[in-house]
């Protein structure tokens, strides 16, 4: 778990037009895990097709849809965290959020995980040859023990769990966790589907709410390498570091 000093040090997250950056102390800024996967991984064709079809080519409509999905996802995550911390909840008149939490509760009751950490901010300041070993940071949803094994679990409200960036995100969290907690490394990785669009009052028995994924360090390194190659042209605020000096005075 993060200490009070660590929470004070890493609570500042700088937002830029190119994602979020964590201040992990000593003047070091690193991109968030989701920022790396967003800009360091290609967008799958099926997702591009969904974006275009759903927005009908209207960028403002896409932003509206994306904002609502983000609101629902954030609300589901926040409420699941409260439940794990022992709070009782009352959620009314918000069907997608209610269904997302219902799905989470069903998974929890089926698997009965023993909570180890909730929403822990993960980062690593270890260097090798003058460079950070893991030049990224992030907040993992849940680390829990199940069947005498340590699982790292990410909650997702998206319609599908097939996006491979989810595997890369969990792999990045595992790398950070293992660096910070060598006494208890992560054994297995999984996604919990907080499904928000099922029919009826409860997910059916056939609804798959839990998906194990395999650690993929090679893909992490590729995403990080591409991200930093892309980011080299920008400063920490997302502005171009160098701009061409254009002629200002003209005469024939």
What is the predicted function of each stretch?
Residues 7-12, 64-152, 161-165, 180, ...:
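Catalytic cores of nuclease domains that cleave nucleic-acid phosphodiester backbones
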Residues 38-40, 160-163:
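A short local loop/turn or secondary-structure capping micro-motif enriched for an aromatic residue
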Residues 168-197:
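Catalytic cores of nucleic-acid endonucleases
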Residues 1-75, 252:
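Charged, glycine-rich intrinsically disordered N-terminal tails and low-complexity linkers that flank
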Residues 198-207:
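Acidic Ser/Thr/Pro-rich low-complexity disordered segments
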Residues 155-156:
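Activation of the activation-loop gatekeeper triad in protein kinase-fold domains
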Residues 122, 159, 196-198:
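Residue-level detector of flexible, active-site-proximal loop/helix-junction positions
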